[in-house]
Amino acid sequence: MSQRTVFFISDGTGITAETFGNAILAQFETNFRHVRLPFTDSVDKAHQAVREINHAGIVDGNKSIVFTTLVDMEVLKVITDNCHGMVLDMFSTFVHPLESELNLKSSHRIGRFTDASKSSAYQSRIEAINFSLAHDDGQSNTDLEHSDIILVGVSRSGKTPTSLYLAMQYGLKASNYPLIPDDFERQQLPPALKAHKSKLFGLTIQPERLSEIRNERRPNSKYASLENCRMEVSEAEAMMRRSGIRWLSTTTKSIEEISTTILQEIRPERLAY
C-alpha cells in the first residue's frame, strides 16, 4: 500500500486531536506518516497548513487524512474549504450537536490546557506526580497513608510506569513498593504496607518476560535468571493470594489497560480531569 499522511491540527497543543486520531487509526493495520501542526491559531497559519496538506497528497498520491480540534471557525473554514484532504473535525462532530442537545453554548476556549496552571486539576496532577516520584520503589514510607493507590510486585513488573501514568493522567497519588526475597522468607508483606491493605493492588508478570526485561538491565545475573524470576513471581503471587490483594498480570497489557483495570477495582474517591 502506498504511503498516506495524517495531519493533527489544533489551535492548542494538539494533544486531543492526536489522541483522538490515533485511537481511530489504531483500528487499521497500516502505517501512516504523522505530522503534528499545533498552535494553528490564525488564518495565515491555516493557509500554511493547507499548503502542507496538499503537498503531502501530491507526493503520496493519496489524500491526506486531517484530524482537527479547531475552535476558531474562521481558521477551520480555511482548512475545510481549501485543503484536498479528508478532514475530520472533533468539534463539528461532537461539540455542536451537544450544544443543541444541552441548549448551551460551549466556551469555545482555545486549547485544552489554556490557563491550566491555574486549575485545581492541574495542581492535583503536579502534586500527585511529585508524590509518586517520592514514593517510587519503596523509597519513602512517609505519608504513605496519603496514597490513593499502592502498587506492589516484584522488581520490573511495571509498577513505576503505571504509578506515574495514574499520577499524570488522573492526579492520583500512586505509591509503589517492591516485593523482595526478604519478604518471601518472612512470608509476610513489608511491615510498612500492613496498615494500608485496602489501597494495595498487585502487579505480576510471566517469569519468561520478566527474565527478558531484567537481562536488558543486568545481563547474565542471578537477578535476571529464569530460575530466580520463576521463584520471585511464584512467591509474590502466593503472598498476594494469602493477603487478599487484588492483582493482574502485566505481561501482555499496555500501561493504559493496566491503569484502567486498577481504577475499576480500587475505585478511588477522586480523579483529576
From Swiss-Prot:
GO MF terms held by the record: ADP binding; ATP binding; phosphotransferase activity, phosphate group as acceptor; protein serine/threonine kinase activity
Alphabetic keyword roster: Kinase, Nucleotide-binding, Serine/threonine-protein kinase, Transferase
Residue sites binding ADP per the record: 153-160
Top-rank taxon: Bacteria
Keyword Transferase: yes
Reaction(s) catalysed (UniProt annotation): [pyruvate, water dikinase] + ADP = [pyruvate, water dikinase]-phosphate + AMP + H(+); [pyruvate, water dikinase]-phosphate + phosphate + H(+) = [pyruvate, water dikinase] + diphosphate
Presence of the UniProt keyword Nuclease in the record: no
Biological role stated in the UniProt entry: Bifunctional serine/threonine kinase and phosphorylase involved in the regulation of the phosphoenolpyruvate synthase (PEPS) by catalyzing its phosphorylation/dephosphorylation.
HAMAP family xrefs: PSRP (MF_01062)
Record's protein name: Putative phosphoenolpyruvate synthase regulatory protein
Organism (species): Albidiferax ferrireducens (strain ATCC BAA-621 / DSM 15236 / T118)
